[in-house]
Every structure is written in C-alpha cells, then in structure tokens.
Amino acid sequence: MRLASRFGRINQIRRDRPLTHEELMSHVPSVFGSDKHESRSDRYTYIPTITILESLQREGFEPFFACQTKVRDQSKREHTKHMLCLRRAGQLTGHQVPEIILLNSHDGSSSYQMLPGLFRGVCTNGLVCGQSFGEVRVPHKGNVVEKVIEGAYEVLGVFDRVEEKRDAMQSLALPEPARNALANAALKYRFGEDHQPVTVSQLLTPRRREDYSDDLWTVYQRVQENLMKGGLSGRTAQGKSSRTRAVTGIDGDVKLNRALWVMAENMLEFFGR
C-alpha cells in the first residue's frame, strides 16, 4: 500500500523505521516546497507539507513511506503531487499495519487528502481502503494545520471498522467461480474490456507460501499485488510476448487500490457477510 498513470514515474522511499528529514529532502523535495506555484491565487493558503508533517509528528504520527511524481516542467518540481504514509506510535510494526495516506500538492492539482490504508510487511505492499470508510479533504485555505490534524484523527478512528472488514474477509472461503469472477473483474478494470494481456489464473497465482489460502482477504491481496507490481508474462493484442507493467503513478495507485477494495467488499456482501 506502489504506484502507469498520467503523472508518470515517481521518486519514492520506504523504510522500516520513521523517515528522516534528510531522506525526505533527497527523495521527495516537494514536501519542503518553500512557496506556492505561481499559478495559485492570493486566496491560496500556502503551508509547506513539512510543517503539516511536523505538527502530525508532535501528535505521534511518523512517515514510513514517501513519494512524489516526476515532472517535465521543472518549475513544478517543488510543488508537484506527493504522498506520505504515516503510522501512529504503538502501531509501527506488524504483519499488517494501519497507515494514514496523506496526499498533497501545491500546483493546484490536489487539496490535502487523507485516506485509510494498510501496509502488509510480508510483501512490502500497501493497500488503500475503499471510500466506504470515508476520506478527508482539506482545501488550501483557512486553518489548514488544525484541519489536517483533525482529519488524521478522523481517519484513525475508522481503523477498527477496517479491521472488522478484514476479519470478515479472512473468514470467508471463496469457491473457485467466485475467485475467478473477482480476478476477471480486476483484469477488465485494469486493462479494459477488449484485451487483457494475462489470464485470470496468472492473477490468482500466489507469490509466496503465505498467500496460498483461498479466503477472500488472501485472494484479494494476491490479485492486488499481481496487478500493482506487474511483471507477469503475457501477450499484447497483436500476439507479441510482453510483461505487465507495475502501476507507477500516485493517482493510478490510489484509483486501482480503491476499485479492488470495492470489488472485495461487494464479494463479501454477495455472500451475505
């Protein structure tokens, strides 16, 4: 819970400990942007993301992952969209760790946005939970710092519900037709209706021993990881050999992750859970 979209390739860093300011500056300089982009009006309240982050750190939230989009227009390098994944003190490590996903930019492409997510340590992969849990958006005006901190606690408050949903998915054994239906829907969402370069069977193939179970939660994670990380051998519409690409844009990551979560939730509801 990493990220091909219209924003292109990204700079990113993840550690199993809180990221330092030096690491953030090296990989995600837009976090430290010193002013709003020239295209923004006087009504735009400019607060560097690092100021927001330091306020969140005082509340016990620490960044473990950060990324920003690469841009062709170098004047936007310090204003481009970026993403931080934050964990609360006391929830820093574990098999599945809740994370607050913070999105922002200072070029007008994004307000402050916070989403609930889960980081799965065994595959170093992040999951974005669907919109059914809500999300927090804070526009760049007024008391931004206070509103973002309130938003972080609001997102923190939904993790009990996320865990309940995860437990329900883990308790549901999926029959083969349901597994195939979930994978087929995911393939069509990712690659379109006309041609899918890989098969349902490939998408359902586990990458490690821990993922051989056929409960809904594990099947969902297999599908998610195979789509997000790519690297699967396939065929183009013209029949040429190819490999699927990893999803490497912030918007693409969040959009696909949300859609997959909704598919898993719908499957859960279909079976009356």
Residue ranges of predicted features:
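Intrinsically disordered, low-complexity regions enriched in serine/threonine
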Residues: 1-12, 90-96, 102-273
